[in-house]
Each structure stands twice: as C-alpha cells, then as structure tokens.
Design a protein with these regions (language model features):
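HIT superfamily nucleotide-processing domains
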Residues: 2-149
Length: 149
C-alpha cells in the first residue's frame, strides 16, 4: 500500500459497502480483486474486476499491488478471450461515477454491433441475464480462470 493510503473501507462507497456489484454476478476471488459479470450483457462477457480495498487511483497502490492487480486483470482478460472467442478486449478504468478502482473488461466479438466505437457510445437497451443463463456464463468463466492459473 502506498504511503498515506488507508486500508479502511469508505462508508460512502457502494463497492466498499458490498451493494455493488451484485453478489449473484460473482465470478472469482483473484487475490487483491474480485471478478463479477456486469449487469448489462449487451456486450456478452462484460466483466468487472473490482479492487477489494478502497483506493481511487492506481498511484494509491504500492508497486507490488499494481503489478498483482494487472496480473489479475490480465488473467480475467485471457479467460474472457477464450470463453467468448473475442477479437479484442477493451480495458476501461474510469472511476468518475464510482470512485473505487475497478476495471471494465469488455470482449469485442465478431458480431460486434459497433466494432470501432467505445461501448459507452453504443446506444442500446439494457440486457440483463438471470437464472440459468447468468449461472452458465459465470461457470464458464470460472472454469476458464481455473484452467489459466
């Protein structure tokens, strides 16, 4: 942990309080972070990698934590590429709406509706998965992560 950074949770942070992401979308405990399927699956496989402790900037992490976090992000990306046969993985680390380090990993597929646009510009209806469809996606990613380790 970088000097001056707290390991305490931020009481105002939805990620720290466990109200986001949804627990039923949990894929794996990766070490420093957890992986979850994003609520919106318009882009199939859209996954979140969420740092377990509260930090808002990469430079708030110790160098060893940054390295480990990037290894965890890469492991999830590799698994997404395998499961979804992605042509490309988009990596997004923003934090404007939720100031807690979390990556959006978005597989871009052969049938991508807007292959040259960032996902944020693609207007679409929310595509939610639930029940067996959600569990199937989670299990496929869990198996791919297990194989990649």
């Amino acid at each position: 942990m970088a000097q001056g950074q707290s390991t305490m949770a931020d009481p105002a942070c939805k990620a720290c309080q466990g109200s986001w992401p949804r627990a039923d979308h949990f894929i794996a405990d990766l070490g420093l972070s957890n992986a979850y399927l994003h609520d919106d699956q318009f882009f199939p496989g859209w996954t979140l990698v969420v740092l377990k402790r509260h930090a808002t900037e990469l430079f708030h992490l110790a160098p060893t934590e940054r390295i480990q976090l990037m290894e965890e992000v890469s492991l999830v990306a590799q698994s997404l590429a395998r499961v979804y046969e992605a042509r490309k993985i988009n990596y997004e680390l923003l934090g404007n709406q939720l100031p807690h380090i979390h990556w959006h990993l978005i597989p871009r597929l052969a049938n991508d509706p807007a292959p040259h646009e960032p996902v944020w510009r693609v207007k679409h209806d929310l595509k939610l998965r639930s029940g067996s469809e959600l569990q199937s996606a989670v299990q496929r990613l869990q198996q791919a992560l297990h194989s990649a380790r």
